[in-house]
Amino acid sequence: MKTRFFTLATLALALAACNNDNENLNGDPVAAQFTADIAPATRASGTTWTAGDRIGITDIGNDSQYGNVPFILKNGKFEAEGKVIYIEDTKTHTFRAYYPYNAVGGILTATTDATAQQNQPAIDFLFASGATGDKNNPVVSFTDKTAKGGEDNSFHHRMSQITLTFEAGDGVNFSVVKPERYTLDGLLLTGTFNTADGIATADNGAQTGELTMNLADGNLTSSIILFPQTVASLPLVVNYKGQEYHATLTMPEGALQAGNNYTYTVKVRNKVLEVSEATIAKWNDIDGGEVNAGL
């Protein structure tokens, strides 16, 4: 798995009147045509939006009519997938959106086990809210407007992430044999995502478990996506040349926070693992530092 760093996804949504003018002169409903300016927006484990990606958009004040409306990315633009959203009155409308789209919406259950990690875009929940528009100003922009004194309406990662980079320490040579896999224990692997408010919640009533990830094709960097959860530390086991090397990852602030990527450097030494302290940033990279792995 390649090293990937994440930026907050941004999405510009333009509401265009049928006559292509910003001002609605005849009072007719304004058909909503959603287009996306995705450069340099990224999503889902550090990749750009991909053709076929689907988001769910809701007109917050008119959610009974325009709730969880699917839009799909085609030719670089998000288009209505069937139903079209209209602004039908003179009020200001506020919108929210989430990724990835689910036809049911509401509170979705998910797992972050090893199988789910193979399709990270499906568990990389994103959420944006607060962007507004009306008939005469039909441009709804899911972007960060704070630089101009406005609000941040951009898409945000709602899950947490841990990224491990493995390095050869004293007495170890990765040129021929590299670590095969690693296991993190003490994780809550199941939880929910609320498409209405963007909150991802770990299932605190569940039993914690292990997550084992193979380091395929000699990759020395691996990222996993997890539900935000309270956890002070996580036992780490690295399998290398038939031996188990043990260490502990310490969580800054005693928790995995939504939108943060906790990065650690794990040095495999002759008989120990050396693990750095975490660094934290907005998917959000949080440097965990170095970790020493020992037998």
What is the predicted role of each segment?
Residues 19-22:
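Bacterial signal peptide processing site
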